[in-house]
Amino acid sequence: MSIVWSLLWLWLLLDGVVQAAFAPADKAALQAAVGTCEWSNCGTSGCLSETSDGSCPIFAASNDASGNPHGVIGEWDVSRVTSFESLFQQARSFNSDISKWRTSRVTNMQSMFHFARKFNADITLWNVSSVTNLESTFFYASTFNQDIGNWSVSRVTTLKSTFSEAVQFQHNLNNWITSKVTTMESTFNSAPFNQPLHSW
């Protein structure tokens, strides 16, 4: 039966009934798409409407540069992107479900959620094994409190300000392998973090 459904889906896709997921080729294309939806200013004149779950339905129905609908952000195929640097920086109301994003090629997550004050979506299962830069990733992400203790961070070289001002974050990171980290300056600056790190 699964073969039948697969063939049906392929037919619908080719017939234009089902749209392929938005698949940015690189960081620039992804940033351009995210930047179009003014998450940090929703509700003000000229900005897109945002629902309580942090999604941007009007944006999902709008078109990318190729004329195809962007679709729901959580369904985007970001598997070719290698950098998430500053992707949602200052997106103060962003809290969409991006748990399904395929992140295995990403090497840079610097400032990804910097000042994304409402972000607390589940990203616990992200594959971050290629990431080397976590500087300021959750800086002032003041609501974030997801269990990312099982992230594979063995290639990370900087944890500078990673959780600075992340005042809600309280999960055990003792399993993180930090042997390649060269700077931990202000990692938990102004964050009431109180979990064991004796294995670091």
Model-derived regions: residue spans:
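Negatively charged
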Residues: 11-200
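Classical eukaryotic N-terminal signal peptides for Sec-dependent ER targeting/secretion
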Residues: 1-9
